[in-house]
């Protein structure tokens, strides 16, 4: 019996030891890593703001010029509650905003950053093209070499659209596209070379040139060929020789980066198509008339606030000064293309390299305030 009791005692001892090992307190866990605190400037930039309105704004003066005159042109920042004249702000504000407005300091405008080559190619969705094409020839040049048969008929010569001539240097074209991509990115816009019909806005079926009051001029077959040639060039990265340059007074502007001939197609005005009635209280300062219908409820506008192209950045002339018309070197024309309304920007004279592009914002309607334009 003795051996049995010894064995039992040993087994119990082993169980106790094992139990002690299992119930032994574990080592304290490592202290959590220190939390990274955001700087106060970043917190304030993202925090929602609330303006405590004063009872009387009669003593408000412009923070730039110090004058309290021209009260109808004084804007109040919805964040700092300070006043600024529309013409004193940089860039200049051309009309009183309908919604909220922030001064340049409170808006936290970011510095325009440069994009890499890969990002530029992806941004514009450039298609690779293996075969070399003639970028400078126009449909008119091709027809010069065709043999004509039949009787000769004399008729009035009509001016035709010319395709733009892109820069020969690929690095220069990349720079040009980079300036446009940076400007669109700064405004949180997508690139689009087409009219866009989004849900909740005007459908494509509403864009019919036959609704235009008084009719709309039809784009000829030859000019349609020029248009399609320019569109094909843009898709493969052969962009017009233009640079988007930021000006402290005018904001984003467009400059010629090469010689542009008279009657050259520059760009189509693109963006979201919507009814004018839906944009009566819209703060977008770049809306373009697309269709002026007999029935005002059917009139359409192009709204380049979410998507667009370089046409959105071309400046307007001042209709209230003698020098305004002298600056104009482009015109905005509306055409019927396959039954739909389209808007094009075309050079009205030869444009030299380094010259800024201007056209008349009030070419069709005198609705746009240009008295503060440079």
From Swiss-Prot:
Enzymatic reactions: L-lysyl(27)-[histone H3] + S-adenosyl-L-methionine = N(6)-methyl-L-lysyl(27)-[histone H3] + S-adenosyl-L-homocysteine + H(+)
Gene3D superfamilies linked: SET domain, Zinc/RING finger domain, C3HC4 (zinc finger)
GO molecular function (one): histone H3K27 monomethyltransferase activity
GO cellular component terms, A-Z: chloroplast; chromatin; nucleus
Domain (SET): residue spans on this chain: 240-362
InterPro entries from the UniProt entry: ATXR5/ATXR6 (IPR053114), SET_dom (IPR001214), SET_dom_sf (IPR046341), Zinc_finger_PHD-type_CS (IPR019786), Znf_FYVE_PHD (IPR011011), Znf_PHD (IPR001965), Znf_PHD-finger (IPR019787), Znf_RING/FYVE/PHD (IPR013083)
Region Disordered: start-end pairs: 16-38
Positions of PHD-type zinc fingers: 59-109
Ligand binding (substrate): 216, 334, 364-365
Record EC number: 2.1.1.369
Annotated keywords: Chloroplast, Chromatin regulator, Metal-binding, Methyltransferase, Nucleus, Plastid, S-adenosyl-L-methionine, Transferase, Transit peptide, Zinc, Zinc-finger
Transit peptide: 1-46
Locations listed in the record: Plastid, Chloroplast; Nucleus
Family: Belongs to the class V-like SAM-binding methyltransferase superfamily.
Cited PANTHER family: SET DOMAIN-CONTAINING PROTEIN
Function: Histone methyltransferase that specifically monomethylates 'Lys-27' of histone H3 (H3K27me1). Has much higher activity on nucleosomes containing H3.1 than H3.3. Involved in the formation of constitutive heterochromatin and the silencing of heterochromatic elements.
Oligomeric form and interacting partners: Homodimer.
Protein name: Probable Histone-lysine N-methyltransferase ATXR5
Gene: ATXR5
